[in-house]
Design a protein with these regions (language model features):
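Low-complexity, serine/threonine/proline-enriched polar segments
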Residues: 135-216
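Short acidic, S/G/P-rich loop/turn micro-motifs used as interaction or catalytic elements
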Residues: 14-18, 74-80, 116-118, 235-240, ...
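CN hydrolase (nitrilase-like) catalytic-core segments centered on the catalytic cysteine
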Residues: 99-107, 232-338
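N-terminal, active-site-proximal structural segment of metallo-dependent hydrolase catalytic domains
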Residues: 1-77, 82
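Cys-nucleophile CN-hydrolase/nitrilase-fold catalytic domain and related Cys-dependent amidase chemistry
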Residues: 48-170
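Short, structured patches in soluble enzyme cores that scaffold and shape functional sites
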Residues: 12, 113, 153, 170-173, ...
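Active-site beta-loop-alpha substructure in enzyme catalytic cores
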Residues: 69, 183-276
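Extracellular structured ligand-interaction cores
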Residues: 3-8, 106, 144-148, 217, ...
Length: 339
């Protein structure tokens, strides 16, 4: 369906690493991957409840699309990246949380970003094969990592239908902030060991329009709205602006950890909007924290109308995030372009 209005909701939570001093950092998270994922998904559920319960949220209004965004790096765990199995389990868990049609039919979730990893292998030596597999991890080669955003429409009733209502966008450019530089131990991945995997695309093209919903490109259509997603540095590097054959963008979405909306990177059409949720700093006060922005192409900056805190009872937030559970910020419902 085509919506008449859009309402942006940002969960402003610090998603940067924990600083230990003398330039040493560590990723915040639980030591067991499955427990870490379960705890973060539970915290997401608490944030969604806070957003729905806010009086300024239009909740179930069928004419208004609610766009709920988390910052970059919300899902990465104590090593800095989840295993392939962990990423698949995470997607299934998130989709299960937002499948209820009565609660989430008119919501679109931009689930921050998830960092996953895989290891390159080499043939095992003769002695290694005597006691193990034919192929082993090649520690001389970089870890293959992907930093991607799951964009999920809610209200699809059956969990098995979740993939039909989802898109995945891969980050293209790795910044110096994406991984810790000096590890505090505990198996944390340092940036020098990482190589990002690129999105899939036809050879020789510079189009960013998705052909398949999980191909990693940044432009897609959902509910007759054209959305463009840029993750942090991709926005500053004008990923969308430099793409060929870019269709008119209704909503430009920028989840980040260390980025603000850049005037020379905006591509949303007249009547459209740009929305940023950042997990690194409060740029108004100049301190570590989190922030959000909404800008109308024709109307300029949009002010927050309400803020809400989370009920975090029973969730070990201190282990998951370096600076607490943050806050949910609600913006007013805004008119969408008519055509």
């Amino acid at each position: 369906m085509r919506y008449s209005n859009v309402q942006f909701i940002a969960w402003c939570i610090h998603t940067g690493p924990r600083k230990l001093g003398d330039g040493v950092e560590e990723y915040a998270g639980l030591s067991t991957e499955s427990a870490d994922i379960a705890a973060r998904v539970e915290l997401v559920a608490r944030a969604l409840d806070a957003a729905r319960d806010c009086p300024e949220t239009t909740r179930d209004d069928p004419e208004t699309l609610k766009v709920f965004m988390l910052p970059e790096f919300f899902f990465r765990g104590s090593t800095g990246a989840y295993s392939m199995d962990g990423v698949q389990a995470l997607v299934a868990a998130l989709q299960s949380r937002v499948k209820d049609e009565a609660r989430w039919a008119h919501w679109l979730f931009v689930f921050g970003s998830t960092v996953g990893k895989s290891f390159q292998t080499r043939p095992a030596s003769f002695f290694e094969r005597l006691f193990g597999p034919k192929y082993v991890i090649d520690t001389s080669k970089p870890i293959e990592a992907y930093n991607y955003v799951l964009v999920q429409k809610g209200g699809f009733t059956y969990a098995s239908a979740g993939p039909e209502f989802a898109e995945a966008v891969l980050k293209r450019r790795q910044s110096g902030m994406d991984f810790i530089l000096v590890s505090g131990g505990g198996g944390g991945i340092a940036g020098a060991r990482v190589h990002y995997l690129p999105p899939t695309r036809e050879y020789g093209t510079t189009s960013e329009v998705q052909v398949a919903s999980y191909d990693g490109n940044s432009v897609f259509v959902r509910d007759q709205l054209t959305l463009g997603v840029e993750i942090c540095l991709d926005h500053a590097a004008q990923r969308l602006k430099k793409a060929s054959g870019l269709p008119p963008i209704d909503l430009q979405l920028v989840p980040s950890c260390g980025m603000t909306l850049k005037a020379d990177s905006l591509v949303a059409r007249s009547g459209g909007y740009a929305f940023n949720c950042d997990g690194y700093a409060n740029y108004d006060t100049g301190v570590l924290g989190a922030n959000s922005q909404v800008q109308g192409v024709d109307s300029g900056d949009v002010a927050v109308v309400a803020k809400a805190s989370l009920d975090v009872t029973g969730v070990n937030v201190a282990a998951l995030f370096a600076r607490g559970a943050g806050e949910v910020r609600v913006y007013p419902a805004l008119p969408l372009p008519k055509d």
